Regions:
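Cytosolic juxtamembrane helix and N-cap/initiation of the first transmembrane helix
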Residues: 1-12
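Core segments of alpha-helical transmembrane spans in multipass integral membrane proteins
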Residues: 13-20, 39-62, 75-86, 107
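Non-cytosolic membrane-interface motifs at loop->transmembrane helix junctions
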Residues: 33-41, 71-73, 96-107
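Juxtamembrane helix-break-helix junctions at the cytosolic face
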Residues: 58-71, 92-94
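Membrane-helix boundary connector in multi-pass membrane proteins
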Residues: 86-104, 119-121
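Short, highly charged, low-complexity non-transmembrane loops/tails of multi-pass membrane proteins
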Residues: 126-146
Length: 146
């Protein structure tokens, strides 16, 4: 899971920075169209900031391994990757858009979604089981009153 989080952090932060700095170039590469209004440029930059935030979250979780927080982040990234595949594929098939990077981006996000699923299917390692089956309750903290 660590490698997935590191690679996701790099990819999404780079895409986010590109959208914030040169949104027209990114839009030209993906759907192959132009950003004609200031509102579209603004929304592109907001999307870039969101991708940077995802990248930062993945980078900060990269050494958490199988923690619940890291697994939750990977589940969120799975949703993001599946939605991105659907939106970009529909842009290509349904709207006939054809930017140079459109289909490579679809393939990349599909592969990342498969990797997310593989990581989530693995049983968590070194994760404390929250429910103690011996006492049928939460694990003891050592500070419980006797």
């Amino acid at each position: 899971m660590n490698r997935l989080l590191k690679l996701t952090a790099i990819i999404e932060a780079a895409a986010g920075l590109a959208l914030m700095v040169v949104p027209a170039v990114v839009v030209r590469l993906l759907p192959g169209s132009r950003l004609d209004t200031s509102a579209a440029v603004t929304l592109g930059r907001v999307a870039g900031a969101a991708l940077c935030a995802l990248g930062l979250a993945c980078w900060l979780a990269r050494d958490d391994g199988q923690s619940r927080a890291a697994r939750g982040l990977v589940a969120a990234m799975l949703l993001y990757n599946v939605a991105t595949v659907a939106v970009l594929a529909f842009a290509g098939i349904g709207f006939g858009l054809h930017g140079m990077a459109l289909w490579p981006a679809v393939i990349l996000h599909a592969a990342m979604a498969v990797w997310c699923i593989a990581c989530l299917r693995r049983s968590p390692q070194n994760e404390m089981n929250w429910f103690d089956h011996k006492t049928r309750g939460p694990p003891s903290t050592g500070f419980d009153a006797h």
